Curated annotation (Swiss-Prot):
EC number: 4.1.99.17
Any GO BP: thiamine diphosphate biosynthetic process
Pathway: Cofactor biosynthesis; thiamine diphosphate biosynthesis
Alphabetical list of HAMAP family matching this protein: ThiC
Domain of life of the source: Bacteria
Cofactor requirement: [4Fe-4S] cluster
The name this protein goes by in its record: Phosphomethylpyrimidine synthase
A GO term from the CC aspect: cytosol
Length: 456
């Protein structure tokens, strides 16, 4: 779809959506996004230029269907997939991608760390995907030196970052905000550093006693991203891994650096979103969202959860969806899903489904709470179908039609029950929706009540 859009841009020094927007140019991607979001193209351009909205769209991801992440657009959901040294293969990861897109993932991150050829699995995912693909390049940087931190050089990081751009990765998590002077601040934590990328860079800095190379070479990374229109997802290496550690000095010190890096990327006209926690008590979620907006000049916020309890292994998709809905309501632009396997193991296809549906509910609830235009239309349509016992319409409008039909059919599987004015909960005699009272009857009652001087 995008070949004809991209061809005229080839050879230009800076082909980012932000660069075009700052120069008053509405790109085809901006027009496409405007139609999807039901917003004016001019507003999309203005928000991209301001940095409050991003369109992750690498020029080498030609089968991408552009989408927007930002405060002006609907709340989005990301799904993580990826092979590990102990589980999965390329075909399984591609199948997870298909399932993620089927159940509504707006973007997908390939977090593969081993067990397969990382280049091959990434290429297969990008080729198959119509949604933006994100990666964490430090994983492959470490894998490229067989896990030897002492052999990992600054140039190794940049080489892998450019390779991901060349392959068509739309956004990359760059853990540039973790500085060597931040490391002592984790001393009082229960769970220390829980970011894999942050852990790798912490080890690198301690071994070499040098500053984070992703920070010192940040402008070089910006130059790479300009050539491909790759977007920064600035990683939060010091995100809290438990409620005890939430909103501590370590997290907030890194957040301040992420704000600095956001503005440095914008000076290069490179798009940015900023990653956030993590594990956060409900009463601290609003503070975390507001603080990110303040420190990072309203760049789109992208949070993992946050989980609002630490005692829900096996059900962390529920614990985190509660926090995600609140974060979305307060203005978070994208929610990174959590599956039932969080903290326990590598998610399988069914875990991907469970996590995604939980997060589509959270994002949708946030859009309703923020009074997005048309956000509640589908809810109202389903409610009308429910009241008229249009079972097939109810299934169709559900976030997971297959699951809704499956649960209905467990007790009433015959086709005749798709027209029945009851389900197995109340049966044919006790469903309150069968006791329909006409508007005419209610008007007559209202008149009688008025004559009796009964206030209603």
């Amino acid at each position: 779809m995008r070949n004809s859009w991209i061809k005229p841009r080839l050879g230009q020094k800076n082909i980012t959506q932000m660069n075009f927007a700052k120069n008053g140019i509405i790109t085809e991607e901006m027009n496409y996004v405007a139609q999807k979001e039901n917003l004016p193209s001019s507003l999309i351009m203005e928000e991209v230029a301001r940095g409050r909205l991003i369109i992750p769209a690498n020029i080498n991801h030609v089968n991408l269907e552009p989408m927007a992440i930002g405060i002006a657009s609907k709340c989005k959901v990301n799904a993580n997939i990826g092979a590990s040294p102990n589980a999965s293969d390329i075909n399984e990861e591609v199948e997870k991608l298909r399932l993620a897109v089927k159940y509504g993932a707006d973007t997908v991150m390939d977090l593969s760390t081993g067990g397969v050829n990382l280049d091959e699995v990434r290429q297969a995912i990008i080729k198959e995907s119509s949604v933006p693909i994100g990666t964490v390049p430090v994983y492959q940087a470490l894998e490229s030196v067989h896990g030897s931190i002492d052999r990992l050089t600054e140039d190794d990081f940049l080489h892998i970052i450019e390779k991901h751009c060349q392959q068509g990765v739309d956004y990359q998590t760059i853990h540039a905000g973790l500085l060597i002077e931040h490391l002592p601040k984790v001393k009082g934590r229960i769970t220390g550093i829980v970011s894999r990328g942050g852990g790798i860079l912490a080890q690198w800095m301690l071994h070499h006693f040098k500053q984070n190379p992703l920070y010192t070479r940040f402008d070089d990374i910006c130059e790479i991203f300009k050539k491909y229109d790759c977007t920064f997802s600035l990683g939060d290496s010091l995100r809290p891994g438990c409620l005890h550690d939430a909103s501590d000095d370590a997290q907030l010190a890194e957040l301040k650096t992420l704000g600095e890096l956001t503005r440095r990327a914008w000076a290069h006209n490179v798009q940015v979103m900023v990653e956030g926690p993590g594990h956060v008590p409900m009463d601290q979620i609003e503070f975390n969202v507001r603080k990110q907006m303040e420190e990072c000049s309203e760049a789109p916020f992208y949070v993992l959860g946050p989980l609002v309890t630490d005692i829900s292994p096996g059900y962390d998709h529920i614990s985190s969806a509660i926090g995600a809905a609140m974060a979305g309501w307060y203005g978070t632009a994208m929610l990174c899903y959590v599956t039932p396997k969080e903290h326990l193991g590598l998610p399988n296809a069914e875990d991907v489904r469970e996590g995604l549906i939980a997060y589509k509910i959270a994002a949708h609830a946030a859009d309703i709470a923020r009074h997005r235009a048309g956000a509640r239309d589908r809810d109202d349509e389903l409610s009308h179908a429910r009241y008229t016992f249009d079972w097939n319409k109810q299934f169709e409008l559900s976030l997971d039609p297959e699951r809704a039909k499956q649960y209905h059919d467990e007790t009433l599987p015959e086709e005749i029950f798709k027209k029945a004015e009851f389900c197995s909960m109340c049966g044919p005699k006790h469903c309150p929706m069968n006791s329909k009272i006409s508007d005419e009857t209610l008007d007559q009652l209202n008149n009688k009540l008025a004559k009796c001087d009964i206030k209603v």
